[in-house]
């Protein structure tokens, strides 16, 4: 999984490795690096999903839109979780950690739509009419369906 990250249209993945004389520091460094990679991937994904929309808006709205994107990236990354983690001690005593972080695409889209709706009435109205909105809405719907399915199967197993 480190060299070949999983491919799933509903998730963004990032893998990192790091070393340290202390095991927890190696894990923390690898996790932080993977989150940084997720941030870059998330920003790229949001930018590509909304490129056609940003070309339609003027400079003032573009600035507000960019700020919303940064806030969303920051907020969503706090909810990332490690999918895989491997730690071992190398021959020289140094600890090496491998971490694979995952982020549900729908969660990012959900946060983005929520921020857009609360942030700028005019911008949200214009955004709703764009193809980018339709794509994000589909990602949110898929994420919510997946969350409900997960809760249903968890409830079934608790009975």
Question: What is each residue range found by the language model?
Answer:
Residues 1-159:
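Domain-level marker for long, solvent-exposed, non-transmembrane regions
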């Amino acid at each position: 999984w480190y060299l070949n990250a999983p491919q799933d249209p509903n998730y963004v993945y990032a893998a990192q490795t790091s070393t340290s004389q202390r095991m927890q520091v190696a894990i923390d460094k690898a996790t932080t690096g993977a989150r940084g990679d997720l941030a870059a991937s998330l920003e790229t994904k949001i930018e590509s999903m909304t490129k056609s929309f940003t070309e339609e808006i003027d400079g003032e709205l573009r600035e507000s839109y960019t700020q919303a994107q940064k806030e969303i990236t920051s907020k969503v990354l706090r909810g990332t979780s490690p999918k895989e983690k491997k730690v071992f001690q190398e021959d020289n005593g140094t600890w090496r950690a491998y971490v694979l972080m995952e982020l549900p695409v729908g969660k990012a889209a959900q946060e983005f739509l929520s921020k857009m709706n609360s942030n700028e009435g005019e911008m949200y109205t214009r955004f709703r009419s764009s193809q980018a909105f339709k794509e994000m809405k589909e990602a949110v719907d898929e994420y919510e369906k997946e969350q409900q399915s997960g809760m249903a199967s968890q409830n079934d197993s608790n009975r």
